[in-house]
Amino acid sequence: MATIPEVPASELIQTMPRVGMGTAAFPFTSSEDTTAAMLRAIELGYRHFDTARIYATEGCVGEAVAEAVRRGLIASRADVFVTSKIWCSDLHAGRVVPAARETLRNLGMDYVDLLLVHWPVSLTPGNYDFPFPKEVILPSFDMEGVWRGMEECHRLGLARAIGVSNFSAKKLEQLLSLAAVRPAVNQVEVNPMWQQRTLREVCRREGVQLCGYSPLGAKGTPWGSAAVMDSGVLQEIAGAKGKTLAQICLRWLYEQGDVLLVKTYNEKRMKENLDIFNWELTDEERERISQLPQLRGLPGLEFISDHGPYKSVEDLWDGDV
């Protein structure tokens, strides 16, 4: 069983495994398959699981953790790190705490280790299929009111740490200026083809842990891109090193100091994704990766609307590269 390095504990967050298992899948995977994959991941050494209300996988993660305890794979729920997120339809000052309680009911847990604001966008309260109709996007996002709700989740012990997802550097700095409890994490798309240089600099300066999703570009998903897996440079580096292209990408994120989220239910790839800790990229390889052309795979077009807070992709991301 692999041992995964952890981000050291700080005043904002307890120790956090540097590699986590993601559970986002559209179309949705059956709950039985998801739960079985989570159990196998625990057997292989994964201890960090990322879920969200909108993924419809909170129950699967909770069932897998409970079954792992029953089987003796882990001693208790405390042996895993669980992240979930408040979806946009609940990103209203008075709805954050009730939404967090619903997440805990879904998980069958008393707390999550990390609770995130999923996107800096509010939708009309209700349940919508994804993608949602544009008319439910509200014209403004009450960042301060939402964050006060997140802070209350932290105060009540519903979440051991709180953070954000899909926040640009500018929005993160805006949040930091008003937060009583600082965000511990910003979870965003990160891979060699979208390196997040501006945001990473801000996160390092402010002590916010960067957590990367889609580290391989999420090829084959509605939101992903083939640019990473089709990169000739990454293929050459992988061939010369005797590693898979995926391992090159994951090692690159690891060397940046990021927490990274992988998503596969294939056991062989689960194992390969953990074989990134006992070797390094060379300076030349890092330099070649730094020169790769940049392409955002997830622009967030679903949140762009003439009557919403973001009229363009530039508005949503504030020019981050």
From Swiss-Prot:
Family, per entry: Belongs to the aldo/keto reductase family.
Q: Which UniProt keywords apply?
A: NAD, NADP, Oxidoreductase
Q: Which organism is it from?
A: Oryza sativa subsp. japonica
Tissues of expression: Expressed in roots and leaf sheaths.
Q: Which residues bind substrate?
A: H118
Binding of NADP(+): at which residues? 214-273
The Enzyme Commission number assigned here is 1.1.1.-
Q: Give the protein's function.
A: May play a role in auxin-induced cell growth by generating hydroxyl radicals, which tends to increase cell wall loosening.
The record's InterPro entries line, in alphabetical order, gives: AKR, AKR4A/B, Aldo/ket_reductase_CS, NADP_OxRdtase_dom, NADP_OxRdtase_dom_sf
Judging by the UniProt lineage, the source's domain of life is Eukaryota
* Pfam families for this protein: Aldo_ket_red (PF00248)
**Designated name of the protein:** Probable NAD(P)H-dependent oxidoreductase 1
Question: Which residues constitute the catalytic centre?
Answer: Y55 (proton donor)
Checking SUPFAM superfamilies in the record gives: NAD(P)-linked oxidoreductase
Q: Where is this site: Lowers pKa of active site Tyr?
A: K85
GO annotation, cellular component aspect: cytosol
Cytoplasm as a keyword of this entry, yes or no, is no
Which is one GO molecular function term here?
aldose reductase (NADPH) activity
- Signals that turn on the gene: By auxin and gibberellic acid.
